[in-house]
Amino acid sequence: MSMRIIVIAATEQSELSLGLLEMSLREGHQVVGVIMRKTLTLERLKEEMRFGLVAFLKKIVTKILQRYSGSVEEQSGWGKFLQLNSIARRSITSACNEYNIPVCKTVSLNSIEALLFVKTLTPTLAIFGGGGLVRAKLLNCVPIMNCHMGLLPKYRGNYPWIWALINKEYDQIGLSIHLMEERLDLGPILRNVPIKLSKNQSLFQLRKDLEYAMIPEIISALAIAEKYLDDKIPEGCYQKELDGKQYYVPHNMLIKLAEKNLKI
């Protein structure tokens, strides 16, 4: 059954958001709108700088190199997915113009204009492709589905797959598709997807494998979300806060430990 979907995009050039938009349409769903954060704002710069200037600059350089690399091996996992699924790389606005999808470009996902945009479109569900923290007002307007790059409920927060490696909990590496709530990574879990490690895998390659799996797993979970939203979310989907822990950005020494543990 077709759902009325809003895609929340991190940036104009977000490969994840573009893949979610295109694949939702291929699966027969209606993408009724896109909410996108404006790239150059003081608020966004402050958010990006919370991990430090070096991390911020490294992120920019990595994104540029991945985007303009002609090699599948050097692209992000999302870029690889686009290429192997014949999705032309272009801006979110360009794709929306082709499909006549309205776009709301906003300073914050929680702005009044974003809330009004959602209310006028009456969507069934929003898919989160990044763009910052989501507050209660937006969550009260529409259910929002997110893909967490770790297995919930145990690993919440930042870099959960690296923390699983640091702790040598290899069976806790994977993706979790969940509905969002204001408490970070604590919404009902729709689906857990373990990811198997490969021989001689690097941290970079593991992250790419996780990224590559995100788009198809999110699209597959739409049917689960639709079923639960039409009926009732089973009790077993709800997380207990004490079943997991909130993790933060790991120190470089711990990242090196994760890489070492990956090769064991």
For the regions a language model picked out, list residue spans one by one.
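One-carbon transfer enzymes
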Residues: 1-264
